Amino acid sequence: MASDGSPSCCSSEPCAGASGCATASFCPTNTTCLPNTCSTSRCQTPSFLCRASLPACCLSPCYLAGGCNSPCLVGSCAWCEEGSFNSNEKETMQFLNDRLASYLERVRSLEENNAELECRIREQCEPNAPLVCPDYQRYFDTIEELQQKILCTKAENSRLAVQVDNCKLAADDFRSKYESELSLRQLVENDITGLRGILGELTLCKSDLEAHVESMKDDLICLKKGHEEEVNLLREQLGDRLSVELDTAPTVDLNKVLDEMRCQYERVLANNRRDAEEWFAAQTEELNQQQKSSAEQLEGCQTEMLELKRKANTLEIELQAQQTLTESLECTVAETEAQYSTQLAQMQCLIDSVEHQLAEIRCDLERQNQEYQVLLDTKARLECEINTYRGLLEKEDSRLPCNPGSGAPMPNSTCEPCSNSMCEPCSAYVICTVENCCA
């Protein structure tokens, strides 16, 4: 019996005397295939399978005991030696038992490996099994602390920038107030200069009026003198010739008339002066009102302009702060995305490696399952072979005569090898039976 090898037939002569043999095959005498070999160069002849002789007409087909299911013609087995079949029964059984024990040991080791691989697969497939990932928590804490410091520094910088801008706005306010006060001072000085010119004109007008009054006084004095001279001349001409009594009003006191005229002129002058002063006061008041309203409007416009400037600067500062905050948030988002993408890539690599290991384990498991099935088939064939050997031994023990060496050998008998080229390698020796031999 040979395992994992091709069936080998032994012959010392070609099968020339057997009818129906188309071809004759040869193999070395007294050879049988050793386990785990397929060449006939390492074959040995088991002594327990030898027959002294077989009938010449023994050409009935026999089958391989290892499940080869291919018939071979059995004549006189030239690979069977002279001797008794029962002489090597113990050695044969020992040999078969050793082979069976080795196969069982191999099956047991493969089952242990299979169980170990199943345990590993079960551990890998457990859903709640924690994935071993590197601990980056302290790095995350450091990064978060630095980010907080950066945000605090940015906020402090923004606050200082706001304070600087507020100081600039206050300086601009004071500068604008100084400019407005300077413009008001210049306007007041211009008004004072204009009023001084008006005062000079009024002084000149007053001088002219006083000179006119003096000239009128001189004219009045001249008129009085002329009237007195005329009166005296008329009196001298009339003399005492004419005495005229007129019932007329009493004579007018010239001093009184002059005083009245003086009072009248003084009243007119006072009225004119009062009117001029009122006109000047009204014009001055109107100019002051216009100046005040213009100053108020200018101050309101300047205040509104400063307020708008302040609002524009505040909005610009807020815009810069929001842009800085947006940039910092975008940087933070980019860093977070890069960090999570790195973690995702690491997890994906870990998943790929685990899947690769799982695929390798599955391949190993399938391969070991195939090997296990092959070993189970081999075990079944071995058990069948052992049972066959046991039955053959029992039959041969019952059929052999007391003197097993008395039989005469039959010449020109061979055992034909399996002619089916598609047959699988037999896992047992070729058994030559004599059940169908023609007597």
Swiss-Prot record:
The record marks A338 as: Stutter. Gene3D superfamilies: 1.20.5.170, Single helix bin, Vasodilator-stimulated phosphoprotein. Residues 237-252 are annotated as: Linker 12. Keywords: Coiled coil, Intermediate filament, Keratin. Residues 397-439 are annotated as: Tail. It holds the Pfam family Filament. There are two types of cytoskeletal and microfibrillar keratin, I (acidic) and II (neutral to basic) (40-55 and 56-70 kDa, respectively). This is Keratin, type I cytoskeletal 40. It comes from Mus musculus (Mouse). The gene is Krt40.
